[in-house]
Amino acid sequence: MLEEIKKIQGINHNEFDSMINTWLEAAKLDLKGIGIVDTLIDTPNSLVQNAIITYVLSFLDVTNAELYANSYLLQKDVLRHTIEYIDESASPLVDSMGVSA
């Protein structure tokens, strides 16, 4: 995802790689924190990957930071309310129907 983010932002050097990787890891931890299944975080499908990239862009793209931050929150909420994405054993606030308490 690092190279994809750099391409989106037109970054053609490695000066920000460490920071971008930090944000990538933070996004994964944030999704894990709401109970997203580990396998989808480790090997993301297009919805999870898009959420992770949007999270990073909310920090990297200063001009559009608020837009990306709001988009990430919406994407995260959709993932959190989709039962296939939730690890019920890791999220005690989700009942058997996938509904948050």
Regions found by a protein language model. Give the residues of each.
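Exposed, low-complexity/repetitive linear segments and helix-based recognition motifs
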Residues: 58, 74, 81-85, 92
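Short, hydrophobic/amphipathic alpha-helical patches that form generic packing surfaces
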Residues: 50-62
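Short coil/turn residues that cap or connect secondary-structure elements
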Residues: 12-15, 60, 64
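Conserved short "hinge" loops at termini or chain/domain junctions
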Residues: 1-48, 84-101
